[in-house]
């Protein structure tokens, strides 16, 4: 059975393909989580990031970041998708956010990054 492809699926498949080839266990784990069906991919609320992250941490969410809760810490959040409300709250808090592809290109070592599911 052929997988239905749309822009999001093509983007996802290309990211998973690149990350699976990476030798670092961190990126292989991210690829494994991204390869799951959408209904099984992590969805993390800002409330959870606020609770578990420290100031300046880099949090990687191999799924979607949702805007429930508030964020007071200046953290770097990396994810496959962000809700509009999450983007707005992070901007107001001074936190930075970027997509997984962009972060991977800038920081292949992923030192000090934390996977949050």
Regions found by a protein language model. Give the residues of each.
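Extended polybasic, low-complexity segments that bind anionic RNA or targeting/receptor surfaces
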Residues: 1-117
């Amino acid at each position: 059975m052929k997988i239905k492809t749309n822009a999001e699926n093509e983007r996802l498949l290309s990211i998973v393909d690149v990350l699976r080839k990476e030798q670092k266990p961190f990126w292989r784990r991210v690829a494994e989580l991204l390869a799951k069906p959408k209904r099984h991919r992590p969805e993390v609320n800002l409330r959870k990031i606020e609770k578990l992250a420290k100031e300046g941490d880099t949090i990687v969410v191999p799924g979607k970041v949702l805007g429930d809760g508030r964020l007071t810490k200046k953290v770097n959040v990396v994810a496959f998708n962000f809700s509009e409300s999450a983007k707005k709250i992070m901007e107001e808090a001074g936190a930075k956010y970027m997509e997984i592809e962009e972060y991977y290109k800038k920081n292949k070592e992923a030192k000090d990054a934390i996977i949050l599911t």
